[in-house]
Amino acid sequence: MAIRKLKPTSPAKRQMTVSTFEEITTNQPEKSLLEPIKNSGGRNSYGRITVRHRGGAQKRHYRIIDFKRNKDGVPAKVATIEYDPNRSANIALLHYVDGEKRYIIAPQGLKVGDMVESGPNADIKTGNALPLANIPVGTMIHNIEMKPGKGAQLVRAAGNSAQLMAKEGKHALVRLPSTEVRYLPIDCKATIGQVGNQEHENITIGKAGRKRNMGIRPTVRGSAMNPNDHPHGGGEGRTSIGRPAPVTPWGKPALGYKTRDSKKASNKMIVSRRKK
């Protein structure tokens, strides 16, 4: 998908780029696969802010995506490639031969009219979903499950792909886009190929208004606040933060502080950590 640079009719638009949406074949989503989304504005059930800098997003519908790919042995035809406002990747509408319709993440190279299938006996071709046990070593994959039958959790963003490195007993060794190498149960399903919409990472937002449409509000620097609002706040004029290193609004180290649980059960599945 190509990127278009806008004419500099304003200072914001001088650097702004947008997608040309060449791969999109329709702007009318399948109504039976839509659900409403309630904008929480970053508040929990008590009305308190639990996530800062959220609110005011453009209203949108959620597209129900088939991450489980559990319709084994039933071929499906790609009917449309569509834009999804809830994710960076595009989505593809599948029409199964038994009449059911489902959305999947659109892989790179998938076109309208292509046939896809899932199950252990499916062919090794883009868009097909198979257990890791049935995928050849070295294959590029995406939409990977972490528990068999739970649905894909890994490698779902635009342009991403992982590589199946080896198979050892009940586990498969997979290298993720972050360069982390980890074991996954060999019965977990994955989809062949790379996630589409590769050019997404090259889009320049350009202006604050586009971020507001995404539901992201401004981030105020801690040093611009009062001392009762942030540990960096206070002082006369522009002063230093008065600490050895920056901290969060709650006093925890802001840079390089590991937040992952050292006793997490899945730690033993990680062979090598990602490169910083």
From Swiss-Prot:
Keywords tagged on the record: Ribonucleoprotein, Ribosomal protein, RNA-binding, rRNA-binding
Molecular function as annotated in GO: rRNA binding; structural constituent of ribosome; transferase activity
Keyword Ribonucleoprotein: yes
SMART domains according to UniProt: Ribosomal_L2, Ribosomal_L2_C
A GO biological-process term: cytoplasmic translation
Family indicated by similarity: Belongs to the universal ribosomal protein uL2 family.
Function: One of the primary rRNA binding proteins. Required for association of the 30S and 50S subunits to form the 70S ribosome, for tRNA binding and peptide bond formation. It has been suggested to have peptidyltransferase activity; this is somewhat controversial. Makes several contacts with the 16S rRNA in the 70S ribosome.
Protein name: Large ribosomal subunit protein uL2
